[in-house]
């Protein structure tokens, strides 16, 4: 179990590691996870993610993970969120935020987007909950970086006489996110395996407000971060989660922000998923995110939701990731808010729902 501190630091580019100097006395050996937004396109050929991973990994312990989400469209500002191990006991805080990180086994290209990936994610998340000593109800965020299918990987699957889940590299990002999110839902007991596999086939509606998955070409396993609250920790950090029902759902956000304010809390960071409503309309009005041949729909969605969340937060260094398959209701997205409370405030995490 790792009691946690969080530092959100702007970056000057994908290769910027200056955040190591902004950890309030913590060192690189204390880092559990680096979760960043980079200014690439967020698509298959976004090498800003690869660059960030390449410069950060040699600086971290082998047990630490990185998750870099490409796409800083609109007002989203590139940054890193660094979760560090903080075993200090803060008086006046009967509980606090805890995190655990891990990796699945290597996901074979023929397994991406399929039940094997769902199962691998489920098994790893369950193991991380056990490590933390928490139950599913204590968890506010499970954030995953998962692999995609490159052209070479697809060709290799065919050479072995197998079939990939898709031959479209961009679609493989969606399929991988979907399988990862359903593995999370299983681990948090939001569905059983039968329902998860039906949802994977598009025959059931399963989603989690605590799942956040993004995919990339820079890894062949899944990097996983679990964020929960625990009575075994004593720090000022808390978390709350909700789901936006669509890209305009400011009410879902303000309700959480208001409850945090009622606790005397201060918002530290927002982790959100966003997608273009697959129906082609939002609240009865047609949108063109899915029919724009110049800009991918995930980029439109990040810009729209990123602007909404940044306006509420007061700055653009917010973690908004595109593609919300099974991560919130269709057309919406999961949201987790991490905040801190003063020692004299109600520290029971009542903002959560």
From Swiss-Prot:
Keyword Ubl conjugation: no
GO MF terms, alphabetically ordered: cyanuric acid amidohydrolase activity; metal ion binding
One Pfam family this sequence matches: Amido_AtzD_TrzD
Pathway assignment: Xenobiotic degradation; atrazine degradation; biuret from cyanurate: step 1/1
Coiled-coil ranges from the UniProt annotation: none
Residues that hold Mg(2+) according to the record: 275, 324, 327-329, 332
Transmembrane segments: none
Active site: 145, 214 (nucleophile)
Region entry RU C, spans: 237-353
Site label Important for substrate specificity, positions: 298
Annotated protein name in UniProt: Cyanuric acid amidohydrolase
Record's comment describing the protein's domains: The monomer structure is formed from three repeating units (RUs) that share the same structure as one another. The monomer, the active site and substrate all possess threefold rotational symmetry, to the extent that the active site possesses three potential Ser-Lys catalytic dyads. It is possible that any or all of the three active-site serines may act as nucleophile (albeit only one can do so per catalytic cycle).
GO BP annotation list: atrazine catabolic process
Role this protein plays: Responsible for the hydrolysis of cyanuric acid, an intermediate formed during catabolism of s-triazine based compounds in herbicides such as atrazine and polymers such as melamine. Catalyzes the hydrolytic opening of the s-triazine ring of cyanuric acid (2,4,6-trihydroxy-s-triazine) to yield carbon dioxide and carboxybiuret, which spontaneously decarboxylates to biuret. Required for growth on melamine or cyanuric acid as sole nitrogen source.
EC nos: 3.5.2.15
Catalysed reactions, semicolon-separated: cyanurate + H2O = 1-carboxybiuret + H(+)
